[in-house]
Design a protein with these regions (language model features):
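Short aromatic-glycine-enriched beta-strand elements
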Residues: 39-41
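Intrinsically disordered, low-complexity, charged/polar segments
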Residues: 45-80
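Short, charged beta-turn/beta-strand-edge "cap" motif at the junction between a beta-strand
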Residues: 20-24
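Mixed-charge, Lys/Arg-rich low-complexity intrinsically disordered regions
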Residues: 1-11
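Short, exposed beta-strand/loop patches in secreted or surface proteins that constitute
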Residues: 7-9, 31-33, 66-67
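Short beta-strand-centered aromatic/proline hotspots
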Residues: 25-36
């Protein structure tokens, strides 16, 4: 899969996030969206620091991910 596209989520979707290759190689993280809240923020996933999750809404998650796409921090997102 090539290219970058805006994600479209429904509550309960399982989202696979694949990050750009960095100094320490490529990392893959899984993010489960459910109950209109998500388990980990993108910053937590990116740094590997899984802390108490923020109570953000599904639309907040979409905005955060879109910002990371726009800033080039996410190469692509695949829903499955």
């Amino acid at each position: 899969m090539n290219g970058i596209y805006a994600p479209h989520f429904e509550v309960g979707d399982h989202i696979l996030i694949v990050w750009n290759e960095g100094q320490y190689g490529k990392s893959k993280n899984y993010l489960v969206v459910g109950n209109k809240h998500f388990n980990y923020s993108l910053a937590d996933l990116l740094t590997g620091e899984l802390i108490t999750p923020p109570q953000e809404t599904l639309s907040d998650l979409q905005e955060i991910i879109q910002n990371d796409i726009d800033n080039g921090r996410i190469r692509f997102i695949q829903s499955f």
